[in-house]
C-alpha cells in the first residue's frame, strides 16, 4: 500500500511540475498577447519614405547631354548611354538611355554627379517583377512620373512605424492609451486634444 501511495505522490508531483512548465510557456504567450503589434498591413498601409530616400531613378530625356558622367561614377558601370555625334550641330545626340534595376545598388552617385540634374531619386520602391528582364528600364520607363504613396486614395500613408517611445525599453511599461504603430501625427494630435 505504501508503494502505491508513493507512486500516487510521485505522479502528483510530476503533474504539478508539468503544470508549471505549461504555465511558464503560456505566460510567455500571454505576455506577447498583451504587446502591441508592430506589423503594417502592407498593401493598404505603406510607410512614407524619408526625404532623402533612394528609390527608383527618374530620368528626364530632354536635359541629358550624353556626357556619360553617370556611367563613370557608377561603381558597377550600370547606365547604358547610346549616343552619336551630330556633325551638323557638332553635339552629341542621345539615342538610348537605360538602367537595369536588377543590378543597380541605388547608391545615388549618378544622381549626385549629373551636371544637368536630369537624374533624380524618387520614393518609389516597389520594383518586384516575375522576370528580371522587366527591371531593365529604358528612357521611356525611367521618364515616367514617380509613384507617390501619399497620392494613392486606396492606401493609408504612415509617417512612421511607432513601436516604443524614446527611453522606453520594456513594452509592458507603456500605458494602454499609447499610440499604435504607424499612427499619423494628425491622429496623435486629435487624440491629445480630445
UniProtKB/Swiss-Prot annotation:
Presence of keyword Translocase: yes
Keywords for this protein: 4Fe-4S, Iron, Iron-sulfur, Membrane, Metal-binding, NAD, NADP, Plastoquinone, Quinone, Repeat, Thylakoid, Translocase
A Gene Ontology BP annotation from the UniProt entry: photosynthesis, light reaction
Entry membrane topology: Peripheral membrane protein
UniProt domain 4Fe-4S ferredoxin-type: residue ranges: 55-84, 95-124
Keyword Ubl conjugation attached: no
Biased composition (Basic and acidic residues): 183-194
Catalytic activity: a plastoquinone + NADH + (n+1) H(+)(in) = a plastoquinol + NAD(+) + n H(+)(out); a plastoquinone + NADPH + (n+1) H(+)(in) = a plastoquinol + NADP(+) + n H(+)(out)
Named cofactor requirement(s): [4Fe-4S] cluster
PROSITE patterns found in the cross-reference section: 4FE4S_FER_1, 4FE4S_FER_2
GO cellular component: plasma membrane-derived thylakoid membrane
Stretches for region Disordered: 173-194
GO molecular function, one term: NADH dehydrogenase (ubiquinone) activity
Similarity field: Belongs to the complex I 23 kDa subunit family.
Record text on subunit structure and interactions: NDH-1 is composed of at least 11 different subunits.
Function field: NDH-1 shuttles electrons from an unknown electron donor, via FMN and iron-sulfur (Fe-S) centers, to quinones in the respiratory and/or the photosynthetic chain. The immediate electron acceptor for the enzyme in this species is believed to be plastoquinone. Couples the redox reaction to proton translocation, and thus conserves the redox energy in a proton gradient.
Protein name: NAD(P)H-quinone oxidoreductase subunit I
